[in-house]
């Protein structure tokens, strides 16, 4: 079997993207890094986004950290998801930064969260810490769009969380708010503050927040797909 090669330009169709992702299934991160001419770090402590960057290289992703989807021409977002030996997610999934100001008139339909989750290429990767990073294998990809029920679940959580932000309650939001979608602080250090709305409508400084999918959402999504296959 010939070895796969990284895509040198963004894929032109979903079929091409999925076919490339399927070729990576079963390879270890160390093998894929070596084939792409990269060095595999010993762990992810200083290179938290390394797996995502590696797979972006292999799949010809274009967006980098820009707000559009990773495969902007196709409207597809790439999400790597660390899983245990049973294929269950090991952590929550970052979606996008939560806007803390300028939210008047924003609806679920026009929200950044919905835009990012409209079409997602999920790639499970072995994530148990007992497996050295270079030996962790890439799993079967899933090209997914939310069904009606999933869209409703996400919408309800998003509306609840955005109401709290708009009403000046951002500091009261905990990871427990939202059944499937949560908001958590997202900052490398506690000094990186951003503007938000306070209880009396005043401007306050607070930690940047991010939207994350909870494990119960991604777990059900992956289980349903891989039982069907």
From Swiss-Prot:
Keywords of this entry: Cytoplasm, DNA damage, DNA repair, Endonuclease, Hydrolase, Nuclease
SUPFAM superfamilies according to UniProt: Restriction endonuclease-like
Gene Ontology CC terms, in alphabetical order: cytoplasm
Subcellular location: Cytoplasm
Principal subcellular localization: cytoplasm
GO terms, biological process: DNA modification; mismatch repair
GO MF: DNA binding; endonuclease activity
Phosphoprotein among keywords: no
A Pfam cross-reference name: MutH
Entry annotated with the keyword Ribosomal protein: no
HAMAP family: MutH
Biological function: Sequence-specific endonuclease that cleaves unmethylated GATC sequences. It is involved in DNA mismatch repair.
Similarity comment: family membership: Belongs to the MutH family.
Protein name: DNA mismatch repair protein MutH
Organism of this sequence: Escherichia coli (strain SMS-3-5 / SECEC)
